[in-house]
Regions:
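Helix-to-loop junction immediately C-terminal to a conserved catalytic motif
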Residues: 62
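Conserved signature/switch motifs of ABC ATPase nucleotide-binding domains
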Residues: 138-141, 159
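Short coil-to-helix segment of the ABC ATPase nucleotide-binding domain corresponding to the Q-loop/switch region
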Residues: 99-106
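Catalytic Walker B motif of ABC-type/P-loop ATPase nucleotide-binding domains
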Residues: 164-167
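Conserved ABC transporter NBD signature motif
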Residues: 70-82
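The feature captures the beta-strand-to-loop junction immediately N-terminal to the Walker
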Residues: 47-49
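Conserved ABC ATPase "signature" region
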Residues: 106, 110, 115-134, 187
């Protein structure tokens, strides 16, 4: 199965976000003059302490929040609101409870006007990436939390977005399931090569997944660190790996200094 993603780059240039805080009675800057270029097919983790601007930045890229200054472009096209060129996976299981699993995954292609039969085939293709093609006719409430989040990931991918935005998608599952989901995501990424921005509080998760780890502090980029680890990555091989531990320690020290 080859990649279905066009060669497009995400460029964040001098982006700021300011809002009025009624409790403080003044404007507050959540994101300050951030510049970041993400090449097509890169996997970028964004990590930092609570309140550093991670989710605010993701919401501006998604088009959910307007920017206060700067620009965010996919190639030369400015982002002015939500669009099918960006897929979003949230921490909560944001599936339609009245639709089957297959209908959830095929929803994006269906909204693009593709025939139902083709959408059903697309849904099965993407569900097979996470071994869930057998639950296509079930409803979300019949699945475990980990299975629901797998469906959420492939539902976002099935619409072939230029950029996949993931906001702490594995935070609400248990540790063992989280590690399995992380390994599955890296396998999907290697096979499909979508561009991914992954928000997390978890330093080890950020290093395990990414090509680059971006550390945010007080709304600014504190560090943009390349991760030189071979792929494919599995926890069994990396958990005691000296390079992995050294990189995780470097990122953790940056986060603690933020």
């Amino acid at each position: 199965m080859g990649s279905g993603y066009a060669m497009k780059n995400l460029t964040i240039q001098n982006v700021s976000k300011t809002y009025f805080d009624p409790y403080a009675g003044a404007n507050v800057t959540a994101v300050h003059d951030i510049s970041l270029k993400v090449n097509q097919g890169e996997f970028i983790s964004i990590v930092g302490p609570s309140g550093c601007g991670k989710t605010t930045l993701l919401n501006m890229i998604a088009g959910f929040l307007p920017i206060s200054g700067g620009s965010i472009n996919i190639d030369d096209k400015p982002i002015k609101g939500p669009g099918a060129d960006r897929g979003v996976v949230f921490q909560t299981f944001a599936l339609f409870p009245w639709k089957t699993v297959g209908e959830n995954v095929g929803f994006g292609p269906r909204m693009r006007g593709l025939p139902k039969k083709e959408c059903d085939q697309i849904a099965l293709e993407f569900l097979s990436l996470v071994g869930l093609e057998h639950v296509a006719q079930k409803y979300p409430n019949e699945l475990s939390g980990g299975m629901q989040q797998r469906v959420g990931v492939v539902r976002a991918l099935a619409n072939n977005p230029d950029v996949l935005l993931m906001d702490e998608p594995f935070a609400s599952v248990d540790a063992q399931t989280r590690m399995t989901l992380q390994e599955e995501l890296t396998k999907i990424w290697q096979e499909r090569r979508p561009t991914i921005l992954f928000i997390t509080h978890d330093v080890a998760e950020s290093v395990f997944l990414a090509d680059r780890v971006v550390v945010l502090s007080k709304g600014r980029v504190l560090e943009d660190m390349p991760i030189q680890l071979q792929r494919p990555r599995v926890w069994e091989n990396l958990i005691e790996d000296d390079t992995f531990k050294a990189l995780s320690s470097q990122v953790l020290n940056k986060v603690r200094s933020a």
